Amino acid sequence: MKMQVTAALLALVCALPSLSGAGVIRGTLRVPAAGAQSSGSANAYPGHANSMAGMPRVEHGLVTDAVIYVDPILARVESTLAAVATPAPKLAQKDQTFVPRVIVIAAGSSVDFPNMDPIYHNVFSLSPARRFDLGKYPKGSSRRVDFRKPGLVNVYCEIHSDMAAFILVLPHHAFTRPSASGAYTLPHLPPGSYRLHVWHPDLGTQDVTVDVPASGDVVENLSY
């Protein structure tokens, strides 16, 4: 998997010179201190899920849960970004939690849902952007879902009501995720005015206008 991602990034770097006069928007995102971890479990699958009680839960408010993206994106820019082949991301069921908590993809992409727990899960969503119900499946099994419509998809487990995750489906590939330190770098963009958006499942959405010059990069630090 790591080699596949590395190869995809190298391919993107090689493709970027075709974007004449491309610049980069980068910076640091600051968020408030992460909240307390959730605990407990509801609707455990009889005879199995109770053994998972007390497992660590996902913290809320982490900077790595954020998604940073821009618009508008020219068709030729999107064509370059979309040309880089990347493996389908995985939203795993692990330790009675969805891992990772947040996934961002472009419309037309797929997501795999592997079960890594020794119990059954039933992953579903009722979101208008993508409704699905994967049914119960055991450890070692996986299901794949295609996402063709932009929008926010809230993902849950019918068996374990405290499990929740988010799939943000964007109309293009001009997005990024901040590192644990909050640092972020967007893909190369042609000169022009862009709307820079930050979305976080716990903190909401912010946006600001950013101008990419004909030469040089732009540093835009963000905070909630």
What are these regions (language model features)?
Residues L19-Y224:
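Extracytoplasmic copper-binding redox domains, predominantly the cupredoxin/blue-copper superfamily
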Residues A7-P17:
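Bacterial N-terminal signal peptides
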Residues T6-L9, T28-R30:
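Short helix-onset patch at the extreme N-terminus, typifying the N->h transition
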Residues M1-V5:
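Positively charged n-region of N-terminal signal peptides that target proteins for export
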